[in-house]
């Protein structure tokens, strides 16, 4: 008998698939779109952690293929943006060259996975034929008022020398390079994602996504209900508007805090406080929002000016503190220290009065040592509101405040508009022309794409200007409206621009007339299953939903959610759970493992290593067990393929149990237990073969079909050995007959007074009377008393109660 030679078998079937593709659209099958989050082509290539997501998506795609679907399973490259440019700078090569080399390397590595990617659909975000449509979307957003320019302090990475969106700042540091983030005043292009806040929030309910991701997006959007209240500034003709979710506590507002960037902040300083106020404003400008919100000791400065509480006329000192952000609410808050931990801490530190306005059972706390933050209680020290329940007043106060003319009921969001420009070279040029007469004018659609000019010096300037600003011949142009001299926008788009819509382009990637034809969009979109890491929960996944809703609104597609189902795979880590990285020296390359054990063994171990949604620690020794299983199954099939064994009832039962167990685990995405299930049933079949003298061909064929999505090369090889003339992937996924799974005989326990005294085998459909009689017969020598009760729990126990 031939030995299992993984190298020869895998080479043979790779070549066969090249000549005879297995996933062909005949126009009759139902489509199934399974998508990976496309990679950005880093210089380090793929390690075994990257393989995991690609293997999961390929196994799922092949399963859909066997279910009779036409599977859309494309791949492409997220190649613009900071990661690619930073790598190019580090290596001292132009990003266009380094990106092309990295794409070629990773494409070779992806080929080793043996995934059924349709490379005819391939896209690359740096291809002008692709980013023509990235720019086209921006132009449409500009025309609809969703893209606008604004100068304001943004997150600034001193190392990457570019602005960052809030989502790109992690623990006060740049997500990409880890440098502490500061603030810089810059002219920026913004996308008005806030216009879609309610739809982005409400439509989460219709998505089959992990609850964790939906919760993260819900919290990021951060919708809250409350009131805006106007506090007059004492001695001035000015008012400060605050946003509060607790207008019921207005009588307890003993001070007010403004963000250091608030437009009135500097002007509120008195002669005595001006120096301290200006220093505080400057110091705050050097901190990132994340730093400012961290749970550490609060800082602040008194402006020397007071506001008037509009409800009771009390003087309220106005402070500045960096824990208030200019871009949340109104950039000013009223502070009720008796009922907010942060305000309480601030008031204690700066000796500000604390007035309790909510009390349990209406009883005031003497000498408060902490804030009373219970959600409900009775109002005290609140004038006409005394005696009301705070939970009721919280809902009624916004309307009451509105009627008094001191504020209005309002809704607020934590979600901010998206900072969409980057001061870098390697990105899509923003298709806007600045004309002194006409203002901002979009590049005419028939002139798209506006291509990125080739330059010698692409390094970031650090001045707040993109390297494109230094290219006079490119910057200087004519206005498409008036024909006068004008200048091009020199900032580029962020790396998220292309990835926010790329999944739409795959199905019509060669179309030079439309982003995607409506015919193909209706036929092949949206995505049925999206697979990738949870780290994209509030970046890419939120942006993609925003883009899709916009494209739905302008009639490009007829759906407003891009991804029906989402699966987030866990990370593969090195020893002790440490993330794999070149710098840590713990990267495991798949190349050697493929050589030594084969692609099929590595694919299966990637899934066997642990539940796919959880992080798992890599251990090379584990692949040996999977490799042994493949050899044993190969030998089992070859040992039995030529035997003329008739199907027995036991074989039939085992076959249908195999189908049931594998499919149930598969559909639960419990892929690690699918692999262990294969191993269990291989052992059962081996034992049955010894007992029966062999295994029937239908059972062997069934096992091969079930295994094929996981070990496609071996699946094809054994399918041919069993007489298959076409690809195993043109077979049909087996169906399970639950009747055939049923046992003829079952084991039940026989108890006396609730204690097990024996076990008997009885027919599965035995009657109560027969079961009790059989049970009594089995323990008759132990029945010494008077029987007072006989109990039969079907298929489980017989219990004889005696005195």
Feature map (PLM): residue ranges:
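Conserved oxyanion/phosphate-binding beta-strand-loop segments in alpha/beta enzyme cores
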Residues: 1-35, 65-74, 98-105, 280-319, ...
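N-terminal catalytic cores of NTP/NDP-binding nucleotidyl/phosphoryl-transfer enzymes
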Residues: 26-93, 99, 122-137, 160, ...
């Amino acid at each position: 008998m031939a030995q299992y030679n993984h190298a020869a078998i895998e080479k043979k079937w790779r070549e066969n698939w090249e000549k005879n593709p297995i996933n062909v659209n005949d126009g009759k099958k139902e489509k199934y779109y399974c998508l990976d989050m496309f990679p950005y082509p880093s210089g380090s290539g793929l390690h075994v952690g990257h393989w995991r997501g690609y293997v999961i998506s390929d196994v799922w795609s092949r399963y859909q293929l066997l279910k009779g679907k036409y599977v859309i399973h494309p791949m492409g490259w997220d190649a613009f943006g900071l990661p690619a440019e930073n790598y190019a700078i580090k290596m001292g090569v132009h990003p266009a060259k380094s990106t092309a080399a990295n794409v070629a390397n990773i494409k070779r590595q992806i080929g080793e996975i043996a995934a059924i990617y349709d490379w005819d659909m391939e896209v690359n975000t740096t291809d002008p034929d692709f980013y023509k449509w990235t720019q086209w979307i921006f132009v449409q957003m500009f025309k609809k008022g969703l893209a606008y320019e604004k100068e304001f302090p943004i997150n600034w990475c001193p190392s990457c020398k570019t602005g960052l969106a809030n989502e790109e700042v992690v623990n006060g540091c740049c997500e990409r390079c880890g440098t502490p983030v500061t603030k810089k005043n810059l002219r920026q292009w913004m996308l008005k994602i806030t216009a879609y806040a309610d739809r982005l929030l409400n439509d989460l309910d219709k998505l089959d996504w992990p609850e964790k991701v939906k919760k993260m997006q819900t919290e990021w959007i951060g919708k809250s209900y409350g009131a805006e209240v106007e506090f007059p500034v004492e001695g001035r003709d000015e008012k400060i508007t605050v946003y509060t979710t607790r207008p019921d506590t207005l009588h307890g507002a003993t001070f007010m805090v403004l963000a250091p960037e608030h437009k009135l902040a500097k002007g509120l300083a008195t002669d005595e406080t001006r120096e301290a106020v200006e220093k505080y404003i400057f110091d705050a400008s050097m901190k990132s929002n994340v730093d400012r919100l961290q749970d550490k000791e609060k800082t602040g400065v008194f402006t020397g000016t007071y506001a008037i509480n509009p409800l009771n006329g009390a003087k309220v000192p106005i402070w500045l503190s960096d824990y208030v952000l200019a871009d949340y609410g109104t950039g000013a808050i009223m502070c009720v220290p008796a009922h907010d931990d942060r305000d309480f801490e601030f008031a204690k530190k700066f000796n500000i009065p604390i007035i309790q306005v909510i009390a349990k059972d209406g009883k005031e706390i003497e000498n408060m040592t902490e804030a009373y933050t219970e959600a409900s209680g009775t109002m005290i020290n609140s004038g006409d509101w005394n005696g009301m329940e705070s939970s009721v007043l919280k809902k009624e106060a916004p309307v009451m405040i509105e009627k008094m003319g001191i504020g209005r009921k309002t809704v607020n969001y934590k979600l901010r508009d998206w900072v969409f420009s980057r001061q870098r070279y390697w990105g899509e040029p923003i298709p806007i022309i600045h004309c002194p007469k006409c203002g901002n004018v979009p590049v005419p659609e028939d002139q798209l794409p506006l291509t990125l000019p080739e330059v010698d010096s692409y390094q970031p300037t650090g001045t707040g200007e993109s390297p494109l600003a230094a290219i006079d011949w490119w910057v200087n142009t004519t206005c498409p409206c008036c024909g006068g001299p004008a200048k091009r926008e020199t900032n580029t788009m962020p790396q998220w621009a292309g990835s926010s819509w790329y999944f739409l382009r795959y199905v019509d990637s060669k179309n030079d007339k439309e982003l995607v034809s409506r015919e193909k969009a209706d036929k092949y979109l949206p995505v049925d299953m999206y697979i990738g890491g949870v780290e994209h929960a509030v970046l890419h996944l939120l942006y993609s939903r925003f883009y899709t809703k916009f494209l739905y609104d302008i009639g490009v597609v007829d759906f407003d959610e891009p991804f029906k189902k989402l699966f987030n795979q866990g990370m593969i880590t090195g020893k002790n759970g440490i993330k794999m990285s070149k710098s840590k020296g713990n990267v495991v390359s798949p190349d050697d493992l493929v050589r030594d054990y084969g692609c099929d063994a590595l694919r299966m171990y990637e899934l066997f290593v642990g539940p796919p949604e959880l992080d798992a620690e890599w251990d090379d020794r584990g692949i040996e067990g999977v490799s042994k299983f493949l050899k044993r199954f190969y030998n089992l099939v070859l040992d039995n393929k030529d035997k003329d064994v008739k199907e027995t009832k036991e074989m039939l039962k085992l076959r249908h149990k195999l189908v049931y167990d594998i499919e149930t685990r598969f559909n639960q995405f419990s892929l690690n237990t699918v692999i262990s299930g294969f191993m269990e049933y291989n052992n059962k079949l081996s034992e049955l073969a010894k007992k029966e003298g062999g295994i029937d061909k239908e059972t062997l064929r069934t096992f091969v079909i079930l295994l094929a999505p996981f070990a496609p090369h071996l699946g094809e090889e054994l399918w041919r050995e069993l007489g298959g003339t076409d690809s195993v992937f043109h077979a049909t996924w087996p169906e399970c007959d639950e009747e055939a799974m049923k046992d003829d005989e079952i084991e039940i326990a026989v108890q006396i007074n609730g204690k097990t005294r024996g076990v008997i085998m009885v027919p599965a459909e035995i009657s109560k009377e027969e079961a009790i009689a059989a049970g009594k017969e089995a323990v008759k020598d132990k029945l010494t008393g008077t029987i007072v009760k006989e109990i039969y729990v079907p298929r489980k126990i017989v219990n004889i109660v005696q005195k």
